[in-house]
Swiss-Prot record:
Glycan-linked positions: 61, 203, 276, 300, 350, 368, 440, 469, 489, 769
UniProt lineage: Eukaryota, Metazoa, Chordata, Craniata, Vertebrata
InterPro entries attached to this UniProt entry: ANF_lig-bd_rcpt, Glu/Gly-bd, Iono_Glu_rcpt_met, Ionotropic_Glu_rcpt, Iontro_rcpt_C, NMDA1-like_ligand-bd, NMDA1-like_N, Peripla_BP_I
Segments in the Extracellular topological domain: 21-557, 646-810
Residue positions binding glycine: 514, 516, 521, 686, 730
Record-given protein name: Glutamate receptor ionotropic, NMDA 1
Chief subcellular location: membrane
Segments on the Cytoplasmic side according to the record's topology features: 579-600, 623-628, 832-903
The UniProt record lists the keyword Endoplasmic reticulum: no
Gene of this entry: grin1
Organism: Xenopus laevis (African clawed frog)
């Protein structure tokens, strides 16, 4: 018996030990709920989760409390009642009082300190999406800002592109604004206006007046109940709740007191099961249970902290458990499909689309998380309308942006009284001018001042305004650019600048300028039919042939001229020598005649030059046969030289040499760029975009990018100043410039053919009428008249098509040569006269000297013959000769001085 008793005790002990080793792991889940009833629902949900995920390893246990009256008591309760029980997660509902938005905050702060996940059940404030504040907060409901997705889908459904966003300047309003702007940016659109106001503002009339002045009639409102009430009251005073308007709001804006003042026809949202705490408890417990079972399949799982007193260590497994929760997917929830985004907010949520009809909210559709499903109930819009409003009001006052680009838009300063000076076209008609505000390029700092605009595009604008019945105000683009996309603050985000940017940002309603139509721009704006067809061409400086004074010598090189001159003198010397030493150099017909003199060196020179210049030989020809043979050879040489010179002179002076211009876009100097040949275009223009996009032109683009100019006017001036060799731009502009500035010329065939169009936003109500009027203007000849008036292609140089003829410039050197000969002749005649006088004086002096010697000799002979006294007459004659000789010496000296002066 004793043995049996011991055996039974041993079996009982072993059974108890085995059972103790198989006890499941108790995992506590905490909750802070609004009522005791919801605590019971929470416990039942935990039991259901244990049954659904039955396992002997893990058993879930429910630990819950109700909300406390203040934040401190709530934080203490979380520490004492929940964290002390080592809870793995805490579920928290919204407090019963609708105005108490901060009760989940102490729970989130306390649990977040230890990295214990907190799952919100009905808390929708956007502040809980900020993970820098609420580290471990998740929720099974979306924030209020998530309603922006439904507004965006409604805009797409009803094709509304013009919206005004009115938000309160608090965290909730800014979150809704950011969400909607992000969605619109993906669609490459934006709100026409964002109006913010301080929460608690009672009179919002001034704010809504800004909205009333806009074309958009779709108003999206994000505000609290009280602020929404103030907006509705001010809108009713301004008659902004009637026909034509659309009001899209969220859930708060049609709740409580706001609903009493909301206008009939307003469309609001209600989150399906948004306030069903019981349903969210069931879904949250199911998600936590699923995540816990996934967590315990991992290794190194630590237990949560036990209590807050003296414990400052975070739960090491807490961040891991949060990541597991955020990656959880529960498709069969009571409230629908449950998933979390990177902020811990619920991704997919279902909304009822409510329409206020006769002061009652009526469901007219459902948003199922992806798209809107409309039911059979018709929407009653503001003003009792049943037809969908267009969402905008066509304004008859348009803001026109343009750019200085002659001949399409001329910009000139106004007169002292602020008006435009009266001018006339080439046809004698008054030029139509408009006042355009814009930066003045001639004043430092480029201040915005009123200026006068006129030209092709201004005439076109005036005609469109008259035909389509709208008024306008014109301004010049602030940055002086046509428009291209550029990165913002070195980020991947790109924005349009120039006229494109002003149009897309709402600063302008229409672009009336020579804006090139291309694919990049057409993706963002709407173009009219082209009002001017054109392409790209190349502008270069014209090589004007210039004649110098020595141009008549250009047919021969200087070496050849030197050899010809040397040959003349060599032949002359040889003729002289041959004729001098020839026995037949002195020729006579018969013996009675005197012999002719042989050829002198001077005559030989005269003969040699005469034959070369074909001046005719009157005398001084060679007499000997040998010299005459050389003379004939020299004549043949002269004939060949003169004929060659004459032929080449015509080529140099009459016929233009072919200029080495650019042949087109495929010219080797463009395709193989170098620093010796610089070409460029305008920065951030359609031409710049074209070269950037074309792979085969990438080499050219890299060269051009370093040299591009800010404006076409600067580049054209650079070509004229020889700072730029070629400028690539719109053919219409360059051909006009070449017709006005005669030192410029376009070259090569057109490429990248396109056209100029009027730019409008994609949703512009004017786009169809503008295109129709442009086509009509082409048909009735108005565009042709504008071409004749403004884009007038005139011939700069009448010689371009006239027969080539010699001008004074070509032959000026020859006339200078004649003038030089005349001057040289006058100079030499003075020398000859002086020389002749000197020679005559010398000869007379010698004659007197001989006469004096003869008299002296006669007297000497008389003395020797015995006469004591000379004859008185002879003595007087001798004295006279001596006196004359003395005066002759004086004159000789004076004449010598004169010759020196002349020389």
């Amino acid at each position: 018996m004793g043995t049996m008793r011991l055996f039974l005790l041993a079996v009982l002990f072993l059974f108890s030990f085995a059972r103790a080793g198989c006890d499941p792991k108790i995992v506590n889940i905490g909750a802070v709920l609004s009522t005791k009833k919801h605590e019971q629902i929470f416990r039942e949900a935990v039991n259901q989760a244990n049954k659904r995920h039955f396992t002997r390893k893990i058993q879930l246990n429910a630990t819950s409390v109700t909300h406390r009256p203040n934040a401190i008591q709530m934080a203490l309760s979380v520490c004492e009642d929940l964290i002390s029980s080592q809870v793995y997660a805490i579920l928290v509902s919204h407090p019963p009082a609708p105005t108490d938005h901060l009760t989940p905050t102490p729970i989130s702060y306390t649990a977040g300190f230890y990295r214990i996940p907190v799952i919100g059940l009905t808390t929708r404030m956007s502040i809980y999406s900020d993970k820098s504040i609420h580290l471990s907060f998740l929720r099974t409901v979306p924030p209020y800002s998530h309603q922006a997705l439904v507004w965006f889908e409604m805009m797409r459904l009803f094709n509304w592109n013009h919206v005004i966003l009115i938000v309160s300047d608090d965290h909730e309003g800014r979150a809704a604004q950011k969400k909607l702007e992000t969605l619109l940016e993906e669609k490459e659109s934006k709100a026409d206006k964002v109006l913010q106001f301080e929460p608690g503002t009672k009179n919002l009339t001034a704010l809504l007046l800004e909205a009333k002045e806009l074309e958009a009639r779709v108003i999206i409102l994000s505000a609290s109940e009280d602020d929404a009430t103030a907006v509705y009251k001010s809108a009713a005073m301004l008659d902004m709740t009637g026909a034509g308007y659309v009001w899209l709001v969220g859930e708060r804006e049609i709740s409580g007191s706001a609903l009493r003042y909301a206008p009939d026809g307003i469309i609001g949202l209600q989150l399906i099961n948004g306030k069903n705490e019981s349903a969210h408890i069931s879904d949250a417990v199911a998600v936590v249970a699923q995540a816990i079972h996934e967590l315990f399949e991992m290794e190194n799982i630590t237990d949560p902290p036990r209590g807050c007193v003296g414990n400052t260590n975070i739960w090491k497994t807490g961040p891991l458990f949060k990541r597991v929760l955020m990656s959880s997917k529960y498709p069969d929830g009571v409230t629908g499909r449950i998933e979390f985004n990177e902020d811990g907010d619920r991704k997919f949520a279902n909304y009822s689309i409510m329409n206020l009809q006769n002061r009652k909210l009526v469901q007219v559709g459902i948003f199922n998380g992806s798209y809107i499903i409309q039911n059979d109930r018709k929407i009653i819009w503001p003003g009792g309308e049943t037809e969908r409003p267009q969402g905008y009001q066509m304004s008859t006052r348009l803001k026109i942006v343009t750019i200085h680009q002659e001949p399409f838009v001329y910009v000139r300063p106004t007169t002292s009284d602020g008006t435009c000076r009266e001018e006339y076209t080439i046809n004698g008609d008054p030029i139509k001018k408009v006042i355009c505000n814009g930066p003045n390029e001639t004043i430092p700092g480029r201040p915005t001042v009123p200026q006068c605009c006129y030209g092709f595009c201004v005439d076109l604008l005036i005609k469109l305004a008259r035909e389509m019945n709208f008024t306008y105000e014109v301004h010049l683009v602030a940055d002086g650019k046509f428009g291209t996309q550029e990165r913002v603050n070195n980020s991947n985000k790109k924005e349009w600048n120039g006229m494109m940017g002003e149009l897309l940002s709402g600063q302008a309603d229409m672009i009336v300028a020579p804006l090139t139509i291309n694919n990049e721009r057409a993706q963002y704006i709407e173009f009219s039919k082209p009002f001017k067809y054109q392409g790209l061409t190349i502008l270069v400086k014209k090589e004007i042939p210039r004649s110098t004074l020595d141009s008549f010598m250009q047919p021969f090189q200087s070496t050849l001229w030197l050899l010809v001159g040397l040959s003349v003198h060599v032949v002359a010397v040889m003729l002289y020598l041959l004729d001098r030493f020839s026995p037949f150099g002195r020729f006579k017909v018969n013996s009675e005649e005197e012999e002719e003199d042989a050829l002198t060196l001077s005559s030989a020179m005269w003969f040699s030059w005469g034959v070369l210049l074909n001046s005719g030989i009157g005398e001084g020809a060679p007499r000997s046969f040998s010299a005459r043979i050389l003379g004939m050879v020299w004549a043949g040489f002269a004939m060949i030289i003169v004929a060659s010179y004459t032929a080449n002179l015509a080529a140099f002076l009459v016929l233009d040499r072919p200029e080495e211009r650019i042949t087109g876009i495929n010219d080797p100097r463009l395709r193989n760029p170098s620093d010796k040949f610089i070409y460029a275009t305008v920065k951030q223009s359609s031409v710049d975009i074209y070269f950037r996009r074309q792979v085969e032109l990438s080499t050219m683009y890299r060269h051009m990018e370093k040299h591009n100019y800010e404006s076409a006017a600067e580049a054209i001036q650079a070509v004229r100043d020889n700072k730029l060799h070629a400028f690539i731009w719109d053919s219409a502009v360059l051909e006009f410039e070449a017709s006005q500035k005669c030192d410029l010329v376009t070259t090569g065939e057109l490429f990248f053919r396109s056209g100029f169009g009027i730019g409008m936003r994609k949703d512009s109500p004017w786009k169809q009428n503008v295109s129709l009027n442009i086509l009509k203007s082409h048909e009735n000849g108005f565009m042709e008249e504008l071409d004749k008036t403004w884009v007038r292609y005139q011939e700069c140089d009448s010689r371009s098509n006239a027969p080539a003829t010699l001008t004074f410039e070509n032959m000026a050197g020859v006339f200078m040569l004649v003038a030089g000969g005349i001057v040289a002749g006058i100079f030499l005649i003075f020398i000859e006269i002086a020389y002749k006088r000197h020679k005559d004086a010398r000869r007379k002096q010698m004659q007197l000297a001989f006469a004096a010697v003869n008299v002296w000799r006669k007297n000497l002979q008389d003395r020797k013959s015995g006469r004591a006294e000379p004859d008185p007459k002879k003595k007087a004659s001798f004295r006279s000769i001596t006196s004359t000789l003395a005066s002759s010496f004086k004159r000789r000296r004076s004449s010598k001085d004169t010759v020196n002066v002349v020389v």
